Amino acid sequence: MFGGSKHIADYDYHVQKAGGDSNAFTNNDYTNYYITIPAPNIETALWLESDRMLALDFSQKSLDVQRNVVIEEFKQRYFNNPYGDIWLKLRPLAYKVHPYQWPTIGKNIDHIAGASLEEVEDFFHRFYAPDNAILSISGNITDEKALELVKKWFGDIK
């Protein structure tokens, strides 16, 4: 999601140029991508997010970079903290048949390392759609202006 789109090669460049920053986090029920940006540059954020939803660029290079990032996050969370791996052991005991039994970040390093580009694309196209998305805007912008910009940048996404 941070590797660019078919139209925008460097997502972070545009966010930073507009005075903002962006990041994401995931839990068992949702993934939150966010941009914090000065109000006069809200349209930049909406342009970037709509393009990411419409034209995400799937490449092996991007997958390899993000896979390494996730593996390092996995190590940090579970192996570089005292008793960090206890959650890997408790989840399957607490949730025998529920998807919560699996850590959001991946079951283990081999599981993460084995993710294929095809699996990532399939997941994206199945779950990253308007029916599964919530767009939230806050700040110094009127409701009318926010709605106008959302229609402009997201209105054609199906």
What are the residue ranges of the model-derived segments?
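Short acidic/His-enriched helical or mixed secondary-structure segments at domain edges of catalytic enzymes
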Residues: I71-K89, L93
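M16/MPP (pitrilysin/insulinase) zinc-metallopeptidase core fold and M16-derived inactive scaffolds
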Residues: M1-I35, W102-I105
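An aromatic/glycine/proline-enriched structural segment found at the starts
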Residues: Q101, I134-K158
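Extracytoplasmic
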Residues: D10, K17, N28-N32, V65, ...
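M16/insulysin-pitrilysin zinc metalloprotease superfamily fold
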Residues: G3-S5, T36-R67, L147
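Acidic/histidine-enriched alpha-helical segments
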Residues: Q16, D57-K75, T142
